[in-house]
Amino acid sequence: MARKMLKDEEVEVAVTDGGSYDYDLFVIGAGSGGVRGSRTSASFGAKVAICELPFHPISSDWQGGHGGTCVIRGCVPKKILVYGSSFRGEFEDAKNFGWEINGDINFNWKRLLENKTQEIVRLNGVYQRILGNSGVTMIEGAGSLVDAHTVEVTKPDGSKQRYTAKHILIATGSRAQRVNIPGKELAITSDEALSLEELPKRAVILGGGYIAVEFASIWKGMGAHVDLFYRKELPLRGFDDEMRTVVASNLEGRGIRLHPGTNLSELSKTADGIKVVTDKGEEIIADVVLFATGRTPNSQRLNLEAAGVEVDNIGAIKVDDYSRTSVPNIWAVGDVTNRINLTPVALMEATCFSKTVFGGQPTKPDYRDVPCAVFSIPPLSVVGLSEQQALEEAKSDVLVYTSSFNPMKNSISKRQEKTVMKLVVDSETDKVLGASMCGPDAPEIIQGMAVALKCGATKATFDSTVGIHPSAAEEFVTMRTLTRRVSPSSKPKTNL
């Protein structure tokens, strides 16, 4: 069945009178998108219910929690571990600033793990209170479709109950994938990596995406020997190639061993740990093997076919520009739709859904100039187009401005690690198409750049802006020398 793409005037605005249904809206999944969609819909007067699995730090078919992947087993606990890992470098840098650190500095993994768990338990409660204060009915259990207006919730005790709703919103997120190789059961995913009882001394990571790079930085900062394997020449496929090179250099500079163009072929248990065999015949012994090879939409147990909801070849729910599925009253937001899989994007999609369905304001999510960050050490952050993307879209030449410098702090600490910044500009309009930064505080700085790009800032706007001195951020408004001018007809290497 082909999806009908809605026009603005065709978007039905819900009448929140309940009608013959139990609820105006039933939401499956209380992650970032589900919670936002629930409470904003309730603020428009809708009668809303939401179902979610019982809380647990590690997800499964029967375990979840309010806040979803980001809060419980993703962005938040990961960032806490990044903070914890960063102190090793700070202690090293402190010496040349006059700090005399005598004796051993011991790291207590169990204490950090305990405090991390306490924080996500707290946040799980915060999300429940937000829903309760918004008037949303919370139901514990796993939801699945019976038909276009009925959801069946399987409770933790195995009992089942059905609820009807005029509209259904699916916001079940995604789950980590495992590579199908012999011994795969010996590996862990990011879920387990955030809750390990013991900190590994020897870690092998398979994958070149942001999760792989972040855990490589985390474990190395905590003292582990880390080997990172990935299929391409550089990690972070999809990011700007020049910035990918910078990240790879920084990882190696921090002591992480990179294995580009290499895959794992087999894992086996030995007396000394896990034996890892690569497709090049190399063998390594590790305490932990992490599969960081991507995530897949959480749609398998929703019984979507019962209502006629279409999915693509990886199980992502197909939606139109308003997040409506192939069934007119069923909607989906967040990772389960596999659009831009970021928490703030799920929040945006859910807000647009509520405005469209219950607010009388048909609103499409705007995916232009969405910023993102990789919390490696140091971090990478970007907004807008990479140089390669700009060349694919440009009708005129692309102007590239770059700055590579030693931050003031490194001048004293003697750390050999440069900060790199980049602006991509349309030569015809002078509009800044993209901004990238790899270095300390990059995500904090790029968030401000995102506002500038969203407002249509030109290079002249940047040049006329007064900087804050001394700061790294001022480099973005002092890059006046053109690094290179690139024609769209050129063919940059894109399969790195």
Swiss-Prot record:
What are the annotated disulfide bridges?
A: 70-75
> Which GO terms are recorded in the biological process aspect for this UniProt protein?
cell redox homeostasis; glutathione metabolic process
Tell me the superkingdom of the source.
Answer: Eukaryota
Q: Which organism is it from?
A: Oryza sativa subsp. japonica (Rice)
Sorted alphabetically, which keywords does the UniProt record give?
Cytoplasm, Disulfide bond, FAD, Flavoprotein, NADP, Oxidoreductase, Redox-active center
Q: Which GO terms describe its cellular component?
A: cytoplasm
The subcellular location is: Cytoplasm
Keyword flag Cytoplasm: yes
- Binding, glutathione: 32, 127
Q: Is-annotated flag, keyword Lipid biosynthesis?
A: no
Full protein name: Glutathione reductase, cytosolic
